[in-house]
Regions:
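Beta1/beta-strand and adjacent pyrophosphate-binding region of the FAD-binding site
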Residues: 1-14
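Short, well-ordered alpha-helix to beta-strand connector turns
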Residues: 4, 26, 141-142
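Small-residue (primarily alanine) positions within well-ordered alpha-helices
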Residues: 14, 18-19, 23, 107
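Glycine-rich FAD pyrophosphate-binding loop
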Residues: 23-43
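Short phosphate-binding/catalytic loops that engage adenosine nucleotides
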Residues: 27, 60, 112
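Conserved N-terminal glycine-rich FAD pyrophosphate-binding loop of Rossmann-like flavoproteins
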Residues: 36-58
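A conserved beta-strand/loop capping segment in the N-terminal third of enzymes
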Residues: 51-104, 124
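Predominantly flavin-linked oxidoreductase catalytic cores and closely associated redox partners
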Residues: 106-154
Length: 154
């Protein structure tokens, strides 16, 4: 059994961003992700420009991913009627494949450990979490972040 400072369960946007943030502050971080990287996710991603200062603080160069600038929103009905709205603050669109891979590589450059495996059990006892994966990895930590998404069965 290996003791870790911080364990993050889930290597999506929340998990990887948390890993980058904590590693920037000097913490030792281990991320457990059930899928391999790079990974496809059937969705696009809109990110508001209001988060740019935070992304800059994390030393993320999102411009290197060639995001699409988004300044308006348009809804349409099945009959073709539309409603349009300007987005004063604006934002950008980027593929999850590209963004997840970028965050994954940044977390590794920051010194994070990424383990591929699915969490099978979480036990909290004596102020410590014991995490067991389906491939028999057992880790312990006083700090665990659950970033496994809303559809997880954990």
């Amino acid at each position: 059994m290996k003791d870790k400072e911080v364990i993050i369960i889930g290597g999506g946007l929340a998990g990887l961003t948390s890993a980058i943030h904590l590693s920037k502050l000097g913490h030792s971080v281990t991320v457990i992700e059930k899928n391999t990287f790079p990974k496809h996710k059937v969705c696009g991603e809109y990110i508001s420009n209001e988060v740019l200062p935070y992304l800059n603080w994390l030393n993320l160069n999102i411009a290197a991913l060639n995001p699409t600038n988004i300044t308006k929103l348009e809804f349409s009905t099945a009959s073709g009627k539309t409603i349009k709205s300007i987005l004063p603050l604006g934002g950008f669109g980027i593929s999850r494949f590209a963004l997840d891979e970028y965050l994954y590589r940044k977390a590794i450059r920051n010194g994070c450990t990424i383990l591929q495996g699915q969490v099978e059990n979480i036990l909290y006892e004596d102020d410590k979490f014991t995490i067991t994966t389906t491939n028999a990895v057992v880790l312990q930590s006083e700090m665990v972040i659950g970033a496994f998404g809303k559809r997880s069965n954990i």
